[in-house]
């Protein structure tokens, strides 16, 4: 964030704001999450507490990381490491798992939390990379036939 940027309160337009840290509680997909030292601003004029865009992005990353930890899911860094160790591109992994475009990118940069099924599949492939050719073969057999008019 630009440290020269002047922060003002959106409620009362005062520039008497102070950066604070406090516990922030939220729910992410019905999972309760508490971030102990969330950075935010408090207006000294009206008492409003708010986040800048950068603080909000940082808090969102912290919340998603906490949810991953609490649910026992792989971190974005581990997903990237597993994919690279398997020699797969992001597009190949998306095709292999039947995912939409850019889903793996979002997992790896932490913007989206992978589901339990994908997490287990990644762990299995990490434990036994020999499953990769078997998975590819199974996918070629299970694809619906092309319909020609």
For each predicted feature, which ranges?
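Short, charged recognition helix plus adjacent turn
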Residues: 135-149
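DNA major-groove recognition helix of helix-turn-helix/homeodomain DNA-binding modules
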Residues: 116-136
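Short linker/helix segments within small regulatory modules
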Residues: 27-37
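Residues immediately within or flanking Cys/His clusters that coordinate Zn2+
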Residues: 6, 40
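Cys/His-rich microdomains that often coordinate metals
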Residues: 13-16, 50
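Short cysteine-rich clusters marking metal-coordination/redox-active sites
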Residues: 9-12, 43
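Extended interfacial segments that mediate partner engagement and assembly in macromolecular machines
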Residues: 52-117
């Amino acid at each position: 964030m630009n440290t020269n940027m002047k922060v003002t309160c959106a409620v009362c337009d005062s520039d008497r704001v102070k950066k604070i840290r406090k516990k922030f509680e939220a729910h992410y997909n019905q999972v309760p999450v508490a971030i102990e030292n969330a950075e935010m601003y408090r207006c000294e004029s009206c008492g409003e507490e708010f986040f800048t865009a950068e603080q909000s992005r940082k808090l969102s990353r912290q919340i998603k990381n906490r949810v991953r930890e609490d649910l026992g899911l792989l971190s974005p860094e581990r997903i990237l490491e597993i994919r690279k160790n398997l020699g797969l591109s992001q597009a190949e992994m998306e095709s292999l798992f039947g995912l939409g475009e850019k889903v793996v990118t979002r997992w790896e940069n932490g913007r989206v939390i992978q589901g339990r099924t994908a997490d287990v599949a990644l762990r299995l492939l990490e434990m036994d990379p020999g499953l990769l050719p078997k998975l590819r073969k199974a996918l070629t057999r299970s694809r619906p036939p092309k319909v020609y008019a």
